[in-house]
Amino acid sequence: MKQTATRLTSFLFLLLVVSIGISAQRVFNHPGGILSSTDLERIKQHVDAGDEPWASCWKDLQSYSLAQNTYTAKPSAEIGGGGTRQRAASDGYAAMLNAIEWHITGNTAYADCAARILTAWGETLETASAELYQYPCRNMIMAAEMLRNSDGSFYEGWAENDRNTFLTKVRTVMYPAAKKFCTYMNSHPSWYTPAALVVMASGVLLDDAAIYQEGYDLMLNTDHWGQMYGGSIEPSGQMREMGRDNVHGGLTLGDITQACLLAWNQGDDLFAAGDNRLLKGVEYWCRYNTGHPDTPFEPLDCSGLDNSTGFSFYYISMHNNGFRLRPDACCFEAVYHHYKEVKGMDDEKEFPYLTIAARLARPDTANELLGFGTLFFTIDTKTSPYMTEEPAKPQDFRAEDGYKCIYVSWKHPENEDARGFNLYRSTDGKSFSLLKTWDYYTNNIYKDEDVEPGKTYYYKLRLINRAGGSLMSEISSATAQPGTDELPGKWNFAGISSGSYGGGMFTTAQDSTFAVSGLGKDIGGTSDMLGYVYKKVTGDATLTVRLTSTKEAFYKVGVMMRGTLDSRGQSAGLTLGETGYRMVRMFYRTSVGNSTSWINGTNYGYAPMWMRVKREGNKFSTYISRDGDTWYLIGSTTMYMPKTYYVGMASCNGQTSGETYEAIFDHVSLEAEDAAPENVPTAPRGLTAIWTDSCTASLSWQSVEDADSFIVYRSTDNVNFDSIATVSAFKLEDKVTLPGKYFYSVAIQYTRYG
């Protein structure tokens, strides 16, 4: 990391010296925010002519609640803080949209509305110090700039005293607060970039070249995590904050894009900075969010971020879903059109994923920050195509059993032609109803938790885009497994510490699933209090699980090795929980009654998450993974623990009373020296198949003692058999597509020992 930082510093120094020089005597262009007078005139001409897509997008804007000229602001003395900042940001957004409508229609009622909103805040605002004040400040400053004419004058209906009051608040409250925030070197990019943007925009609004230069330099400040490249965006395009969550990465791109637009309208090319670093960041974001979880991510040392030490971002976060097709602040259209139409770059070669995302997401409509990017930035419809053909039929559609849930998945569309889906469900395989519609979302996995344990459900899927829906998928069925409290083999449950209680449940679904309920104060300190599902082993061992619990009602959950079941005993393992339910840390207690030591992993970890704890001699190591294939070491320690010990999964709710928390771990695999069964079960016997109708075969066979599950195979030639299901019962209803002659075979799956 140090070498990379040095190279970046040298590059940026040369860039600043050679490419960036801003005159203190400059004259600003107005309106000079995200839209110039040229942009506004282009929009007006297309809207007046009824051209598409501008006319339809304009109609959408004018029907939007925040774009009404009757909008009333709700000002307060403080502009930041929970609840207040969101409403203040909406007020600023409303003022911006009304100001744009004034330019396009000439109707002063819109300008009057924008002026009323800004005047109300100018008269009321006293401080900008509470949480994330930079967001609403940015919106209001941009809105005020949009109330200007091309000669620099303001809308004449905005009374001079009212206008000056607002401008004074920008100079004395908003700008200083944003500038101060940029001195905090440990903040996230999505917090820093809007603050730097506030400084830049203040300079334009106040016609103050020195302030504008401050903001411009802050965007390129190589010492801060949040500056627009090297900090927010790596040279590869990797978005740093996507290791935190997907949404904040999009927020960062939105603010950098607005800064680039503002600078471009003043004659400065931030778009080109860092070898088109903004384009690389948007392309990276779009690659992941068009449904490509294989997007590479190099782990980052986050020491100092959030005033924390020893934490890292290991992979693109599982938080806030991901796979969203709409970055905030209308940035995908602005970036696409600038690099494609203004700079003439080849979109298919140089930013193919942005091109895919733009084509799928058009037309851009309202979102939390600005939206309407298709209306604002489309220059030529020939270079901005919409989807005109429905998606292809879903492939490899399947439903799979889960513990009290069902997983539905399908293959990512090869033609990149789907932007969402309609999922249908039935309890009889005949009468289907719509279960879920998800638009502007490219994930191809859905977890159905609104199910009755023990019940079988049938599913079918239609992919969607702007042009319509695909052909319906084949039908697939699965059962929400209720689990059993009879744990397999030598697995057991224990409440660690007196007063702790809970229990364990098991099902063969998802390659062996354990649900661990635990009431307990903590994992750590000099003694533990938790629920523990474990197995006694001897020698080296590796426990691998996928933690799937997503309900944030726990304190700490994870994997653990223990020398004894005594609450004060030696232990080593990995937990998720604590602050925000998202801290991942390794723990170890080297001797009975000693304090627990911790090794920080990440403070932005979320389920689903793969976990692993491994013992090799007296060395104990812990790992996490996003996909179960690529693993990242959290920490290792060398300590004594008896050769025979306990390994398993733990859950505690942080309380000494009340309800337990059920942590769910699937794909449980234990590799241990003594983990093999003494006697391998015999093959199932008594297999029978009876046709209950022309396309349904009812299969049954005899129970086998200690078998975990059964794999059912089917063939049409009695030679080549394909696996069709894994079940824990001794029967299966097999629905085939066509009547005919079929052959079946059943084998035992014996996974509990690993």
What are these regions (language model features)?
Residues D448-G469, D734-Y753:
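Beta-strand-rich modules
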Residues P385-A418, P453, N465-T484, A676-D706, ...:
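Pro/Thr/Ser/Gly-rich low-complexity, intrinsically disordered linker/stalk tracts
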Residues P413-G429, V704-F721:
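Solvent-exposed loop/turn segments flanking beta-strands in beta-repeat/beta-sandwich domains
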Residues K436-T442, S723-S728:
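Short beta-strand segments within Ig-like beta-sandwich modules, predominantly Fibronectin type-III
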